[in-house]
Amino acid sequence: MNTILAQQIANEGGVEAWMIAQQHKSLLRFLTCGSVDDGKSTLIGRLLHDTLQIYEDQLSSLHNDSKRHGTQGEKLDLALLVDGLQAEREQGITIDVAYRYFSTEKRKFIIADTPGHEQYTRNMATGASTCDLAILLIDARKGVLDQTRRHSFISTLLGIKHLVVAINKMDLVGYREETFARIREDYLTFAEQLPGDLDIRFVPLSALEGDNVAAQSANMRWYSGPTLLEVLETVDIQRAVDRQPMRFPVQYVNRPNLDFRGYAGTLASGSVKVGERIKVLPSGVESSVARIVTFDGDKEEACAGEAITLVLNDDIDISRGDLLLAANETLAPARHAAIDVVWMAEQPLAPGQSYDVKLAGKKTRARIEAIRYQIDINNLTQRDVESLPLNGIGLVEMTFDEPLALDIYQQNPVTGGLIFIDRLSNVTVGAGMVRELDERGATPSVEYSAFELELNALVRRHFPHWDARDLLGDKHGAA
C-alpha cells in the first residue's frame, strides 16, 4: 500500500472514516494543454510523484521504463506515468487523452492530459469539455506559440473560466525572472481577445526538477506566489449549474412493471423537490413530482449532478430526449441556431451537408445552412470561408429536423452542447456549442390524421427506446 495513503487512513481512524472524509472533499477537474513537448505529461507525473501517489511497484516499473523509453537520460522520465499507449512512448508524445486521479488533504483531483500536436486538437477539445480549470504549459525557451493560443481559445470556448499559465522548463533558461515576465506580458496581451471574464494566474516552474510544482523553488526566490499545487488546492470553483434553472434531460424511461413508471437521467442544473410543478418539452405538458428515486432510496430533493429517477403524479407522454424543467420557466424549442463548432473530421464541414446531432439524450438530424466565419487562431480574427477544415473552429448556422429545447452553452453546457455524428459511419465528427437561438419556424406546418396521432402516442408509450418523435407537438404547432 502507498505509505502516505496508509498514514492518512490511520490518521482518520480507519478505512470507513477515511472514506467518509473523502466524500466530503471538493473535486477539481482540470486539464493540461499547450504546444507539443512543453512538458504536460512530465508535469502530471511530477504532481503524482511529489504528492506521493505512486505505489512502489509503479515506481519500480517507471525506473525500468525510463531506461527503455525515457528521454531524460539518467533521470526518471515522469511522463511515462501517463503516456500509456505504445505509440506515445515510441514517439515521445501524447496522442490520446489520459485521465489520472489523485488527492491531497484538501481536495480530490481528476486530471486530463491532452495532446499538444495540432492534428490531435480534437482529442484536446474532448478532454476540456468536462473540466473546471486549464493548465496551459508554455516552454520558457519558446514563449507563446500557435497551439498555446488554440488551446486557450478552445478552453474558454468550452466554458473554462480558470486558466493557470505554467511557464515550464525554467531550468533551461537559468531561472531568469525577465524570461518569465516577458512571456507573462505576451500572454496577457493575447488573452485580451479571449471571450468571457477569466481568472488567469501565472506560475514559473520546472516539471522535470520539481521547482514550484508541489514545493517552493530555491532557484526562483524572486517569485513569491503560490506553487502550482497550492493554486489547484485553493482555487474557488463556483459551478454555475448549481445556480441555473432546473434542467433534467430524460435518458431512459424506467418501467420495470405495470405499477411503476419513472424517468431516469442526471440532473443537469438547478434542483428539484418532491411536489414541485414541472413542464415537459417539447410538448409543454405539466405535472408534479411524486417521488425522487435514487440508488440509496427516495429523496425529498435532488441537486445538479445527481443521477435520479423522477416519478410524476400524472401519466403523461414522455420519452428519451425530452427535457423536464420547472413549470414557471420559459424555454421555447428552436429549429434554428448558431453553433460554435470544433470540427474533427478529415472531410470539411460545408453548407448543405446533413448530420445526426446528439444533445443530452436527444438524437435528431440537422442541416448546415451557412458558415458565418472561421476563427484565425493566431490572432482570433474572423475570416470568411466556404468550408470548415479538420481542427477548424467557426460559427455555423444550422436547422434541425425538429424543434429542440436548447440553452446557450455558456449558461448550461449539458443542454447547450451537442456532437455531430456521420450518418454512414456513425463516427463523431464535430463538437458544437450553442451561441444563438432563432425560434422562427420552431414547429413545422404539418397536419396528421387521428390514426397517425394515436399510433404515434402508442409507440412512444410502449416503445420509448425507438425514440419516436412526438407528432402531437407538431400538430399543436401547426394549429
From Swiss-Prot:
Entry's EC annotation: 2.7.7.4
Region (G3): 113-116
UniProt-annotated binding residues for GTP: 34-41, 113-117, 168-171
Region of interest (G4), ranges: 168-171
Region (G5): 206-208
Residues spanning the membrane: none
Region (G2): 92-96
MF terms (GO), sorted A to Z: ATP binding; GTP binding; GTPase activity; sulfate adenylyltransferase (ATP) activity
Enzyme class: transferase
Protein name per UniProt: Sulfate adenylyltransferase subunit 1
Catalysed reaction, written as an equation: sulfate + ATP + H(+) = adenosine 5'-phosphosulfate + diphosphate
Stretches the record annotates as G1: 34-41
Family affiliation: Belongs to the TRAFAC class translation factor GTPase superfamily. Classic translation factor GTPase family. CysN/NodQ subfamily.
Quaternary structure and interacting proteins, as annotated: Heterodimer composed of CysD, the smaller subunit, and CysN.
Domain (tr-type G) ranges: 25-239
HAMAP family the record matches: Sulf_adenylyltr_sub1 (MF_00062)
Pfam families: GTP-eEF1A_C (PF22594), GTP_EFTU (PF00009)
InterPro entries: CysN_GTP-bd, CysN_II, CysN_NoDQ_III, G_TR_CS, GTP-eEF1A_C, P-loop_NTPase, Small_GTP-bd, SO4_adenylTrfase_lsu
Annotated metabolic or biological route of this protein: Sulfur metabolism; hydrogen sulfide biosynthesis; sulfite from sulfate: step 1/3
Record NCBIfam families: CysN, PRK05124.1, small_GTP
